[in-house]
Amino acid sequence: MKKIFLTTVLAILTIFSFASKPHIDNVVVSTENSTIKWIGSKISENHEGTVNIKKGILMIDHGKLVGGQFSIDMQSISTTDMSDKLNKKLDGHLKNEDFFNVEEFPLAIFTINTIQKASGGVNSFEILADLTIKGITHPVTFISTVKIEGLNFSAIAKIKIDRTKWNIKYGSGSFFENLGDKMILDKIEFDVTLLSVN
């Protein structure tokens, strides 16, 4: 009887040990279908555009997002709200040392660290991540709508950052005086949509 009891206990422990082991699937982000749109603002006007994802992986454990990382091709940053001539002029400025200095820092890196449930719906999550721009890393926190079916996923988020934390101070009223209507707000907004390759 004692032997049977011990055998049963061992069997139960074995089942639980297997059940508790994480099973991480590294799911590839579709660079063709995923998008990042940016919005930058001055006192009197906004500008918007896009920047491309170079590559990315999201980590899924039994249908839950648990981590991930994707790189952003800063050399692809482009403006979309003006004429071609004006767009190219602003693109060149965004790529130089005043802003993202893409020749020296061609990639930005986004690393997801922790994910926890948020209010706002069954698919709403609060995500804490590290964002590296121009070799400078700072944490960012935001709410994302995440949907996962097997190894298919979609994640949508609106992320706002203070650009000056990444040493992007050009035209900032926090560092320069008497800018008038040439002052550029410190906040940059990114609308991010990530989709899986599957």
Predicted features and spans:
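Low-complexity, acidic/polar, glycine-enriched regions of mature
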Residues: 18-198
